[in-house]
A protein has these predicted regions:
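Conserved SAM-binding loop
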Residues: 3-86, 179
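S-adenosyl-L-methionine-dependent methyltransferase catalytic module, highlighting the catalytic core
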Residues: 60-67, 73, 77-181
Length: 181
């Protein structure tokens, strides 16, 4: 395992060029590890990139974010996708413990306005590189293409969407965030 990219909680989404970690010994999984058991089985600053797709909503995510921060190299990036709080998927899966706003992970970014109580955690990412709200793209819901484009025009548009009736009228699918160590 010499890859410098980690696919955390990969499930069946095994990615070439990544260390693929999951709690189940599925085909292609390189490391079997329960993400509820920390620390992660890697040295400090082992990875330049971490993919964390559809994982955090199943766990007590703050300690795992701390571990992701530990195994990332300085300047390394973590890409996170989790269900948006307006998504019905939040409620369909009994293993989901939490849902996310586009701003939830800003709590862990040094100097961010949302990080006013960041003293509860011993780690902080240096910056938020990107944050998007995604929507289901089905032929039966063609308006979602336009809604997604409008909602993601700016952080103010995202806040307006989440804080008004629009979030209930046009439920989102996921939040996608990239944090930099």
């Amino acid at each position: 395992m010499t890859a410098d990219r980690l696919n955390l909680g990969c499930g069946t989404d095994v990615r070439p060029g990544f260390v693929n970690l999951d709690s189940a010994a599925l085909p292609g999984v390189d490391v079997v590890h329960d993400l509820n058991v920390l620390p992660l089985p890697f040295e400090d600053e082992s990875f330049a990139e971490v993919v964390c797709q559809d994982v955090l909503e199943h766990l007590d995510y703050a300690p795992l974010l701390g571990e992701i921060h530990r195994v990332l190299r300085p300047g390394g990036r973590v890409w996170i996708r989790s269900p948006h709080f307006t998504s019905r998927a939040v409620y369909l899966d009994p293993t989901h413990r939490t849902a996310f706003s586009v701003d939830t992970l800003r709590f862990f970014v040094r100097g961010d306005a949302f990080a006013e109580r960041s003293y509860y955690f011993p780690f902080h990412f240096s910056r938020l590189e990107s944050a998007r709200i995604t929507f289901h793209r089905y032929r039966a819901m063609p308006w979602n293409y336009a809604v997604e484009a409008l909602v993601n025009r700016s952080p103010a548009a995202q806040a307006y969407y989440e804080g008004t009736f629009l979030g209930r009228l046009f439920p989102a699918s996921n939040v996608e965030v990239t944090l930099v160590k």
